[in-house]
Regions:
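Single conserved hydrophobic/aromatic residue that forms the stacking wall/gate
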Residues: 1-12
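Short acidic/polar active-site loop segments enriched in Thr and Asp
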Residues: 19
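AMP-forming adenylation/ATP pyrophosphatase catalytic core
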Residues: 22-278
Length: 278
């Protein structure tokens, strides 16, 4: 969405005759030969290059990110020195376009409720949910089942959302095998400049502010897939997988499906649907 907004801002730039569009993103731009590269912001705790991975190199050539070389505290200090009224405003931590609204309440206004069962990996019913759209893979808080009689006290995590049965599958323990994936299939791949050749080494980030992991990107007959150097938790279809080499953001894609032999075998035994894109 942010990349599309930057593109829209470029249209405004063209219509007004401005030379550049400056935005408040914590990211940087550097020249590399004939290309303009998108770089991580120097303040790693605020870096927003993840959200800009769909911006084109052409648009980057006409963009300015003045905050990219600064820390948040430096920005606040500049604001205080210039008596700006928002100099001490609290950081926003939610989804910017819904304001102070509760996320679930906001979604329910558009999608309503679609109740279903919460089950464990063996199909035992543990409770009920009001809609799969209110949960994400790897989620621990807010599942709504609490302690389960006769079970260990370990935390429950969302491992699978089955659209056909409308079941939310949860497992116990952050180290449960069903939470981990060895890679993922990608859709709607976008390269900011030149694409990487197949089998290239890179780092991939699967959510905002998550630690990037070493990986290899591979081109298949149906698109791209990524193999991680080690299994990682909560790889979520629909989220963005953003590709880096060092500080440079090369582009990214939508996660189409996770790659996990444990998950595939379990899903097949349980009769749940999954896709393999090779």
């Amino acid at each position: 969405m942010i990349a599309r907004l930057v593109g829209s801002e470029m249209c405004i730039r063209d219509s007004t005759g401005a030379d550049y569009i400056a935005t408040g993103h914590y990211a940087r731009i550097e020249c590399a030969g004939d290309n303009i590269q998108l770089m991580r912001g120097l303040d790693k705790s605020k870096d927003q290059s993840y959200f800009l991975h769909q911006v084109s190199g052409i648009d980057l050539n006409r963009a300015l990110f003045p905050l990219g070389e600064l820390s948040k505290e430096q920005v606040r200090s500049i604001a205080r020195d210039n008596n700006l009224i928002n100099a001490n405003k609290k950081d926003s931590v939610g989804i910017c376009f819904i304001g102070k609204n509760n996320y679930n309440d906001f979604i329910s206004n558009f999608l309503g409720k679609n109740p279903g069962e919460i089950v464990d990996e063996n199909g035992t019913k543990l409770g009920s949910h009001e809609g799969l759209m209110y949960f994400t893979l790897g989620q621990r808080q807010g599942i709504g089942i609490g302690g389960v009689k006769g079970r260990e006290q370990a935390s429950w995590y969302v491992a699978h959302k089955d659209q056909n049965s409308n079941q939310l599958v949860v497992v116990q323990g952050a180290d449960n095998d069903l939470l981990f994936s060895e890679g993922c299939y990608l859709d709607e791949m976008h390269w900011i400049n030149e694409k990487l050749i197949s089998e290239s080494d890179c780092e991939v980030q699967i959510r905002y502010q998550s630690e990037p992991v070493s990986a290899k990107i591979i081109q298949t007959k149906q698109g791209y897939k990524i193999n991680f150097s080690e299994p990682i938790s909560a790889v979520t279809p629909g989220q963005s997988a953003v590709i880096y080499q060092g500080e440079v953001c090369l582009g990214g894609a939508v996660i189409k499906e996770r790659i996990s032999e444990n998950y595939f075998n379990w899903a097949e035994n349980r009769g749940y649907n999954y896709e393999v894109y090779e």
